[in-house]
Swiss-Prot record:
The keyword Nuclease applies. It is an enzyme of class 3 (hydrolase). GO terms for cellular component: cytoplasm; ribonuclease P complex. GO terms for biological process: tRNA 5'-leader removal. Consists of a catalytic RNA component and at least 4-5 protein subunits. It is found in: Cytoplasm. The gene is rnp2. This is Ribonuclease P protein component 2. The keyword Nuclease applies. It catalyses: Endonucleolytic cleavage of RNA, removing 5'-extranucleotides from tRNA precursor. Its EC number is 3.1.26.5. The lineage of its organism: Archaea, Methanobacteriati, Methanobacteriota, Methanomada group, Methanococci. It comes from Methanococcus aeolicus (strain ATCC BAA-1280 / DSM 17508 / OCM 812 / Nankai-3). Its main location: cytoplasm. Belongs to the eukaryotic/archaeal RNase P protein component 2 family.
């Protein structure tokens, strides 16, 4: 088994809270594709892999994106540059940048962390129960 890296060697992360203004509701996969394509168009393949984007959470219209600390400005500018999706206008507003998921959810997404975590756990249990019923 591999040991975990000490905090001094780990990659430093930041969490960007954003809000999407769009006519229709987008799924998490569509948001991931939208973010990935905008980063590649704005920053290139090497730059987009360097910022290491990861969608932590998305519930329409707000979401949380994890990126590396050094690439915050590039990712923010790439997200702001998105203006069209499937020939419809779209706008992404950056609500803020935080160092932790908890503070980002409390400050920008206005969701208490503990309650939110319990809701996610309940949804996972419901989905696993539904999957068992399908089998």
């Amino acid at each position: 088994m591999l040991k975990t890296l000490p905090p001094t060697i780990r990659e430093k992360k930041r969490y960007i809270s954003f809000k999407i203004i769009y006519n229709n509701e987008l799924s998490g996969g569509e948001v991931v594709n939208l973010i990935r394509s905008s980063l590649i168009n704005y920053y290139g393949v090497w730059g987009s892999s360097k910022c290491n984007p990861w969608l932590i959470d998305y519930t329409h219209p707000k979401g949380l994106l994890r990126i590396t600390r050094e690439e915050v400005d590039f990712v923010k500018s790439a997200l702001i540059s998105i203006n069209e999706y499937k020939k419809n206008p779209i706008n992404i507003i950056i609500l803020g940048v935080s160092g932790t998921i908890k503070k980002s959810r409390e400050k920008f997404l206005k969701v208490p962390h503990e309650k939110y975590y319990k809701v996610i756990q309940r949804r996972k249990k419901e989905n696993s129960y539904k999957n068992r019923l399908r089998k």
